[in-house]
Amino acid sequence: MAPSISIEQPIALDARIYKDEVFSWEDVRYLVLSNQIKKIHRHPSVQVVYQKWMKDTLEKYGTIENYLLSTKLHFPSATNTSSEEPPVIILPNDFPYSVEKGIKHILIWSQTPLTPDYVEKIIQKNYTPKEWEWVYFVNPPEVQSVKKLPHVHVFLRRRLF
């Protein structure tokens, strides 16, 4: 069970009116933990590239899921896994959200929805909690660009000592 966390809205976040902002760690953490994830977005220059990529990929593969499964997400067959936990693939986001330098934006892909406990286990296995801090979320269905392949957005940064 996750500990109770008190969060305060960063002052700079409240004052922003432009869409080309770069989100700080405090911004990302606040928006994720307060369930305002729709406010986190790509930089406009990345969004333009993403939209062109989506159009081209849909023309070539029919769906984004087809593209991902044929080029990036090579899940083991059910007969090759002995674990009860579903296999996952961790990849950097090719079109990351607009976050400041030092924040990684990765995706945890699966063939089945993942529980929060399992997501935490995956992250802790790959990123030592003493060295890293993170927040994660699943986009609501209305803004998911890949609806048929469950995936979790994770933002990480090295802990500041």
Label each region the model flagged.
Residues 1-161:
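HIT superfamily nucleotide-processing domains
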